[in-house]
Amino acid sequence: MAKGVREKIKLVSSAGTGHFYTTTKNKRTKPEKMELKKFDPVVRQHVIYKEAKIK
């Protein structure tokens, strides 16, 4: 079977709470770093989440 193009990434909260989401993205079509506004349950607000590598 062929390997998939999608890679696992981690979206880390910019609020500094340590909260993160995991998702996948296609590095071939979207080589730039992902930034999304998502809900951070620790501070109970919508904040910017930035892409980081999964260790």
Curated annotation (Swiss-Prot):
GO terms for cellular component: cytosolic large ribosomal subunit. The keyword Transmembrane does not apply. PROSITE patterns: RIBOSOMAL_L33. The keyword Nucleotide-binding does not apply. It holds the Pfam family Ribosomal_L33. GO terms for molecular function: structural constituent of ribosome. Keywords: Ribonucleoprotein, Ribosomal protein. It comes from the Bacteria. GO terms for biological process: translation. HAMAP family: Ribosomal_bL33. Belongs to the bacterial ribosomal protein bL33 family. This is Large ribosomal subunit protein bL33. The lineage of its organism: Bacteria, Pseudomonadati, Pseudomonadota, Gammaproteobacteria, Enterobacterales. The gene is rpmG.
